[in-house]
């Protein structure tokens, strides 16, 4: 057996339909598209969300919510990720240097996820209650 001798099982593959090739083919003249109408035409398709002129669902429902501008410049940092930071005092600049946050981030919040293996000093970052307890348990402290 070689790759060039392989072929599908008999009856497995059928020839593609050649539309518009006479009455006898069953797909002549209108090529299976029916008579007139949008879907019979070239490029004719109903756009997603179009409901035949009725007001579409996405326009019937009310708008809601907004994107907080503060959340765009705020990052969340896991407690376990602080182990990657080599600085003794961890602040925004130290997090940037460790590649934990992007350059556009101006505020960061440390939350309890994972374990802290070394004593660190947190300066100028927001900290959750659980993270604060874990940092102090590891011998670290939090400065405002």
From Swiss-Prot:
Pfam family name, one: Ribosomal_L27A
Molecular function GO labels: rRNA binding; structural constituent of ribosome
Composition-biased stretches (Gly residues): 21-31
Single Gene Ontology BP annotation: translation
Stretches for region Disordered: 1-54
Keyword field: Ribonucleoprotein, Ribosomal protein, RNA-binding, rRNA-binding
InterPro entries: Ribosomal_uL15, Ribosomal_uL15/eL18, Ribosomal_uL15/eL18_sf, Ribosomal_uL15_bac-type
Coiled coil: none
Gene Ontology CC, one term: cytosolic large ribosomal subunit
Record function comment: Binds to the 23S rRNA.
Assembly and binders: Part of the 50S ribosomal subunit.
UniProt xrefs under PANTHER family: 50S RIBOSOMAL PROTEIN L15, LARGE RIBOSOMAL SUBUNIT PROTEIN UL15M
Family note: Belongs to the universal ribosomal protein uL15 family.
Entry-linked NCBIfam families: rplO_bact
HAMAP family hit by this protein: Ribosomal_uL15
Protein name: Large ribosomal subunit protein uL15
Gene this protein is translated from: rplO
């Amino acid at each position: 057996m070689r790759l060039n001798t392989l072929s599908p099982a008999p009856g497995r593959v059928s020839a593609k339909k050649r539309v518009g090739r006479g009455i006898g083919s069953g797909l002549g003249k209108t090529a299976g598209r029916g008579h007139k109408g949008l879907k019979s035409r070239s490029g004719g398709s109903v756009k997603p969300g179009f409901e035949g002129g009725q007001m579409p669902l996405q326009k019937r429902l009310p708008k809601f919510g907004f994107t907080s501008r503060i959340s765009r410049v705020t990052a969340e940092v896991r407690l376990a990720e602080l182990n990657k930071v080599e600085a003794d005092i961890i602040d925004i600049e130290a997090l940037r240097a460790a590649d934990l946050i992007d350059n556009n981030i101006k505020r960061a919040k440390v939350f309890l996820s994972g374990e802290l293996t070394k004593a660190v000093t947190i300066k100028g970052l927001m900290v959750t209650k659980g993270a604060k307890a874990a940092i102090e348990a590891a011998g670290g402290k939090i400065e405002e």
